[in-house]
Amino acid sequence: MYKEFAYIYDKLTFDIDYEKYSEVIKKELKKLAIKPKSILELGIGSGNMTKYFYNSSLNYTGVDLSKDMLEICADKFHNITLINEDLCQLQLTENYDFIFSTLDTINYILDSEKLQNLFSNINENCKGVFMFDINTPYKLIEVMGNNHFVYEYEDIFYTWVNQYYEDDNLIDFYIDFFVKNEDNSYQRIRENQTEKVYSLDAIRFMLYNSGFNAVKIIDFDTGKSLEDYTQRALFICY
């Protein structure tokens, strides 16, 4: 994922309010009286969320499958440990006060058994709290569904076509980017992605089965209670 277009990824996330999401997370950390000295960020990408939690005095580790994205992240932060690894293959060797993952990284894990194992692995190495978000079934089925979208931003034009497979609880994203070059020609970059539709109850069950004693779920966009139309749900687990 994000192979060729890693270098334009930051520009393509212009409409994501990272600061708002970080404030929701910080509010939940404050409620639990957790001031983490060690942080593990899963699916760190190019570090767009990282800047709201990182400082050089922390033991900060980030994991991502994309080497290209990690190279961008490494240019932004010093004194940070970056691991190029599939989350489901990750072997954690130390404990962390705070483990988190944002922007539907969990939805990209298509095998429920692998996700269950990941949660168990995280529980064993989490001394404080684990937080992550998912795209809800409402968003993936009702909002995204079999729809298509067209976007234009600065020198980038792109189309986004979805295909939802109800029997498999999967949704494919077919994204075509057209990036304007200096000579006014366009470079086409195609990216195909797949997300799994997980019910909130199924995720909750896996978390309890992994050993977490408490699981709280809120609307990540509002920081408040879940609604029928919640598109992004934040899980707080400890």
Describe each model-derived feature in a short phrase.
Residues M1-G45:
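Conserved class I S-adenosyl-L-methionine
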Residues G47-Q89:
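Class I SAM-dependent methyltransferase SAM/SAH-binding core
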Residues Q91-F98:
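A short acidic, Gly/Pro-enriched loop at the edge of an enzyme's catalytic core
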Residues T102-D104:
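Residues lining the SAM
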Residues Q116-V129:
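A short glycine-rich, Lys/Arg-flanked "PGG" loop and its adjoining helix->strand segment in the class I
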Residues I134-A202:
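SAM-dependent methyltransferase
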Residues K196, L200-Y238:
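C-terminal lobe and adjacent flexible extensions of AdoMet/dcAdoMet transferase-like proteins
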